[in-house]
Amino acid sequence: MYKRIFVGLDGSPSARLALNEAIRIAAASGGEVTCAYVVEHRPQLVDVDAGFPAERDGDVAAVDAATPVLDYAKSVLELQHVPGTVRALDAYGEDVAAVLMRTAAEADADLIVMGTSGRHGLRRLLLGSVAESLLRAADRPVLLVRHDEPVAAAKAR
């Protein structure tokens, strides 16, 4: 049974389902959960005459996005009485899947749990998939928890 479970979070509905599944497994096995949110610092064009505040603002926004997600994960872990930790990780241009895999290895995780959406066709091709990249390169078991987009929302896009 899995005792050290690592879950990647991004604030999406599928990530919440993945968190719930990781907690369920940890509760059944007497294990613990490590939750991680990767903060991506995307390159931005900067007006040299204006200085660099826009870039810093983008970094602050990226870090701020992680806070409610990790706070939610911490509260769910506490509510379910499952031991765990939450972490924000900086990617700084590195592939998100690589950051997650490295951190899971550092945590000596038995299992990586990730959410994945039910995107198809061009949307999936354009957006890519961190979960798929991680699955292809992982050196330990990976559980993908799928969240299908509602049909009406998918058609509207």
Q: What are these model-derived regions, one by one?
A:
Residues 75-112, 150-157:
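Structural beta-alpha unit
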Residues 140-152:
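Short, flexible loop segments at boundaries between secondary-structure elements
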Residues 3-55, 76-85:
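Small/aliphatic-rich secondary-structure junction motif
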Residues 18, 45-48, 96-99, 124-125, ...:
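Short, well-ordered secondary-structure micro-motifs
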Residues 38-68, 103, 151-157:
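Acidic, proline/glycine-rich short linear motifs
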Residues 111-133, 151-155:
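Glycine-rich, Arg-bearing micro-motifs that act as flexible, cationic patches
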